[in-house]
A protein has these predicted regions:
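N- or domain-start disorder-to-order transition segments that initiate the globular core
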Residues: 1-24
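Histidine-acidic residue clusters that define the catalytic metal-binding segment
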Residues: 1-7, 86, 144-150
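M16/MPP (pitrilysin/insulinase) zinc-metallopeptidase core fold and M16-derived inactive scaffolds
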Residues: 27-91, 133
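Stable alpha-helical elements in mature extracytoplasmic
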Residues: 42, 46, 64, 95-98, ...
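Scaffold signal of the M16-like zinc-metallopeptidase fold and its non-catalytic homologs
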Residues: 53, 57-58, 98, 105, ...
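M16/insulysin-pitrilysin zinc metalloprotease superfamily fold
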Residues: 57, 89-122
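Short, glycine/charge-rich beta-strand/loop segments that flank catalytic centers
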Residues: 79-87, 114-125, 141
């Protein structure tokens, strides 16, 4: 059984961590307490768009994936109604690279017009593939408003 440790840093960041000495890999999950529920009903998709923009580079790291891959890591992210989760895995000896990448984009995301246009297209294509081009793919979008009527 793993001992789960919880801390709140001086900047308010909540840290939950546990150690597994049976592996040489480290997993980092950065979870933002924001998702589709925070969007205006007439302006949806921003949580997912920002998820993608987080991979567009930061002020000090123009390409997020290159240094991560050089450190032997991999990453992905997902968004739902309640949270946006970014995760990466790296070999234990390169955990500082993972923290460096996450902290740099947390503090200095490169929010350029070019990146916005590229990622907007990617998000729209994902929506088409997952929802519009699938039988009953739009059911969740149609039923969701009915599930939360007050």
């Amino acid at each position: 059984m793993f001992k789960v440790n919880r801390q709140i840093l001086d900047n308010g960041l909540r840290l939950v961590h546990c150690e597994d000495t049976s592996t040489q890999m480290v997993a980092l999950n950065i979870v933002y307490d924001v998702g589709a529920r925070d969007e205006h009903p007439q302006h949806t998709g921003f949580a997912h768009l920002f998820e993608h923009l987080m991979f567009g580079g930061s002020l000090h790291i123009p390409d997020y994936d290159t240094p991560l891959q050089l450190a032997g890591g991999e990453n992905n992210a997902w968004t739902n109604n309640d949270i946006t989760n970014y995760y990466l895995t790296v070999p234990r000896q390169n955990v500082e690279t993972g923290f460096w990448l996450e902290s740099d984009r947390m503090l200095g995301l490169d929010f350029s017009e070019r990146s916005l246009e590229v990622q907007r297209g990617v998000v729209m294509e994902e929506f088409k593939q997952r929802c519009l081009n699938q039988p009953y793919g739009d059911v969740g979008h149609l039923l969701r408003p009915l599930a939360y009527l007050l």
